[in-house]
Amino acid sequence: MTYLPVALTIAGTDPSGGAGIMADLKSFQARDVYGMAVVTSLVAQNTRGVQLIEHVSNQMLKAQLESVFSDIKPQAVKTGMLATTEIMEIIQPYLKKLDCPYVLDPVMVATSGDTLIDASARSYLKTNLLPLATIITPNLSLIHI
């Protein structure tokens, strides 16, 4: 029996399907990769902008991470929108234990220009998550940050 490679995305949602975990899962599927997702934030957005962001509870975030990592071992992990320091602090121990490639996509600003991450979270990301990444995939507009 042939098994598909498995990848995990940890990010926010995008109901329009153009970004976030929805886009990640479509990308995985297009490459014949079995995709799993842990949702960090629920984002109401469209092509006109971001209307509302609600972060999942710490309890829910931890439960999703435990559910995935206790069952199916990903062969690659990608993080996207990690909007708060608290979210990053919960995820970081899982990233430290990885024995697979980790892709860090530092999503800080929506395509519409709306800010998705605060200054303290940006600093935490640079100091604590950047060193763990196998590869970093910032948008061109974020390279100077």
Model-based region annotation:
Residues 49-135:
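Ribokinase/PfkB-type carbohydrate-kinase core domain
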Residues 1-76:
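Small-residue (G/A/S/T)-rich helix-start motifs and N-terminal tracts that mark the onset
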Residues 25, 92, 140-141:
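Short glycine-/small-residue-rich flexible loop motifs, especially phosphate/cofactor-binding loops
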Residues 12, 105, 139:
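Active-site glycine-centered loops adjacent to acidic/histidine catalytic or metal-binding residues
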Residues 143-145:
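Conserved small/polar residues in nucleotide/adenosyl-binding loops
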